[in-house]
Amino acid sequence: GGGSTYTPELIDGFARLRDTLPVEELVLVDPAADRLELVGGLARRIFAKQGHPGTISWTGDLDAGVDGADAVLLQLRVGGQAARNQDETWPLECGCVGQETTGAGGLAKALRTVPVVLDIAERVRRRNPDAWIVDFTNPVGIVTRALLTAGHRAVGLCNVAIGFQRKFARLLGVAPGEVTLEHIGLNHLTWERAVRVGGEDVLPGLLAEHGEAIAEDLRMPRTLVDRLGVVPSYYLRYYYQHDAVVRELRTKPSRAAEVAAIERELLERYGDPALDEKPELLSRRGGAFYSEAAVDLTSSLLGDTGEVRIVNTLNGGTLPFLPDDAVIEVPAAVTAQGAKPLPVRPLEPLFAGLVANVTAYEHLALEAALKGGRERVFQALLSHPLIGQIAYAEKLTDDLIAHNREHLAWA
């Protein structure tokens, strides 16, 4: 995904944080040559402006691009924004949320993505068996589980946690590094159960003083946040307010259509030889702070630092009500051996039930992605808490296959 419009955000992070992660060589790999040329040119100008001594090159040859790599970062989108637009629209016909990582749309993305990612990972392993794979590719939980199940050296990463850390630090008037989160759940299904500064949980005071602003940012009622007593991730809105979200999505253009328009303008700007920094427009694309999270995680993996990062990794008994091979999103100590989750308090039943349900869905989704077949797709959809009815699951199965046939080898 080196030609992604996200890439300048990542490049800017590498340039600014070169003391944390001194990159000698960065290779952008993407099959889209035109985009790659635009993004690569801007990447070089960003490095040059900030005085970074590392080299940047780009190629459409995956094997050549990963040869000799210490770490490989994945941020790809199989089918592009056109496929995303489908993921966000056809589920609405059944009254189910249309979203690229949640529900039927999320399953469609997983089915398209997992085989491609596993092929890339196998080629990385053949070239560099010790290389780490850092996955940003959604749905991160399912993709990371696929990688780890296949024995790859992989860690999944999302920008939700670092986004909350930065937001809370700003509200509290402290440096981001002073804020630690008790972040728990699955990718795109998490809650902040504590916000600590100097070892003290300041979440109750944070909600008392800034609860209205936090709830508004989440687009959830203040009363819900107060009654939960935690800060849910933005994606919990699809569960706690499902029907309202469906009504809202039916009345406006899809997020994919909005992003596609932003991407067209971004690529036009990237081609300007005078541009030597990430444009402000990129902030509307999403993905804030993910470059910093990526730099921190990669530096811990390659530097064997043992620092705590919030990542997607194997459960391994951390949440005892989940299988050991489930992938959870929690704080973990990151070393050259990978990510080891820190011990956590038992998860409250109010949250644990949903986590268990979605974990079961993710298991079935991965089975469908690896083995194919209409019945496996149907079972995954039927198990999802946002679907759960046979009539919906049957129609969504047919629609998913019809819209994604070119990406499904078995269909």
Please provide the spans of the model-predicted regions:
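N-terminal Rossmann-like dinucleotide-binding module
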Residues: 2-22, 26
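Rossmann-fold dinucleotide-binding core
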Residues: 8, 132-201
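Short helix-capping segments at alpha-helix termini
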Residues: 18-21, 47-53, 126, 172-174
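NAD(P)-binding Rossmann-fold cofactor-contacting core
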Residues: 19-46
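Short acidic low-complexity segments
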Residues: 55-68
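Redox-cofactor binding/interface segments in oxidoreductases and associated redox assembly factors
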Residues: 67, 73-74, 135
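Rossmann-fold NAD(P)-binding glycine/threonine-rich loop
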Residues: 78, 82-150
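Long, compositionally biased stretches enriched for glycine and/or charged residues
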Residues: 170-411
